[in-house]
């Protein structure tokens, strides 16, 4: 009985797993390429993971706003009576009760010092900035400035507001300090924004054609200052040209070069004249350079007179 139940359970499990196996095989197998172009094989990977997911890259423009002057306005004047100070300092949130009245005594003795210390902390964001007394609350409002940023200017990131409350609890507006010599703020924001980086696509054969241009860009950026300042790029070539210029600057070397050129020119003229003379003698029929000599030593002889006798 147990064996029959076990066999039935195994058969049901096999029937349930069969559609899932058929679906995975159908997904992993590439479609039939009927036209023979091979375009359908690019959508599948050889690892058996199925069809590759479509990767969509979204580019969100980064916005950078300059922080304007921080202005604080007091809603009510500071209390001057001891009762009001005590009432304002005893109101604390839950979980931060004073121990033995010591903190209350310190607040009563030095209310101005604690208010100045609390006011010196820099505001983190556009949030409420309460002081130590609850009666006189001050709100810090961030005035957004224009979004245009000048080149080679950057707002100082570590800006702290150190102005203490003067008069009736008002704080003087402190403008952010701008220094020169840095890259534009928009370029920094674009570099730090991860959404601007486009992901690398996956597929068969794409890794073979991926080139890393960061080293070349760094080498080109490092070589630009030298080329702008007129620095030599190849020290060996510049050394050779400098040595040749130094040799030509000497008068002895320059005179020797000119004399050698003149001697060569004279030798070429003589060679051409000799060749022309040989060609002329060849046309006359004599290949020797000397004049032809007569056999009798050059003496003149009269021809013999022949007499004819008539019969």
UniProtKB/Swiss-Prot annotation:
Residues 71-84, 215-226 have a biased composition (Low complexity). Its main location: membrane. Shedding is enhanced by a number of factors such as heparanase, thrombin or EGF. Also by stress and wound healing. PMA-mediated shedding is inhibited by TIMP3. Pfam families: Syndecan. Residues 151-162, 169-180 have a biased composition (Basic and acidic residues). It is a single-pass type I membrane protein. The keyword Secreted applies. The record marks 251-252 as: Cleavage of ectodomain. One of its GO terms (cellular component) is extracellular region. Residues 23-255 are extracellular. It is found in: Membrane; Secreted; Secreted, Extracellular exosome. Interacts with CDCP1. Interacts (via C-terminus) with TIAM1 (via PDZ domain). Interacts with MDK. Cell surface proteoglycan that contains both heparan sulfate and chondroitin sulfate and that links the cytoskeleton to the interstitial matrix. Regulates exosome biogenesis in concert with SDCBP and PDCD6IP. Able to induce its own expression in dental mesenchymal cells and also in the neighboring dental epithelial cells via an MSX1-mediated pathway. This is Syndecan-1. It comes from Bos taurus (Bovine).
């Amino acid at each position: 009985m147990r064996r029959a139940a076990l066999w039935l359970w195994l058969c049901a499990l096999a029937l349930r797993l069969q559609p899932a196996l058929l679906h995975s095989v159908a997904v992993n197998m590439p479609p039939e390429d009927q036209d023979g172009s091979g375009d359908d094989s690019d959508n599948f990977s050889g690892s058996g993971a199925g069809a590759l997911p479509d990767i969509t890259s979204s580019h969100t423009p980064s916005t950078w706003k300059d922080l304007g002057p921080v202005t604080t306005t007091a809603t009510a004047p500071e209390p001057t009576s001891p009762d009001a100070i005590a009432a304002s300092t005893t109101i604390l949130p839950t979980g931060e009760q004073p121990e033995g009245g010591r903190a209350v005594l310190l607040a009563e003795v030095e209310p101005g010092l604690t208010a100045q210390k609390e006011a010196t902390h820099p505001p983190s964001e556009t949030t409420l900035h309460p002081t130590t007394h609850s009666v006189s609350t001050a709100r810090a409002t961030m005035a957004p400035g224009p979004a245009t940023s000048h080149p080679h200017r950057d707002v100082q990131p570590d800006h702290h507001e150190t102005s203490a409350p003067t008069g009736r609890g008002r704080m003087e507006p402190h403008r952010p300090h701008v220094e020169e010599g840095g890259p534009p703020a928009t370029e920094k924001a674009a570099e730090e924004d991860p959404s601007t980086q486009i992901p690398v696509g996956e597929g068969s054969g794409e890794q073979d054609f991926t080139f890393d241009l960061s080293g070349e860009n760094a080498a080109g950026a490092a070589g630009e200052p030298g080329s702008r300042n007129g620095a030599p790029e190849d020290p060996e070539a510049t050394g050779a040209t400098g040595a040749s210029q130094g040799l030509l600057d000497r008068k002895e070397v320059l005179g020797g070069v000119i004399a050698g050129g003149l001697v060569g020119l004279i030798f070429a003229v003589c060679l051409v004249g000799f060749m022309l003379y040989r060609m002329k003698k060849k046309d006359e029929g004599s290949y020797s350079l000397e004049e032809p000599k007569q056999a009798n030593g050059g003496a003149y002889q009269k021809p013999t007179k022949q007499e004819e006798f008539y019969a």
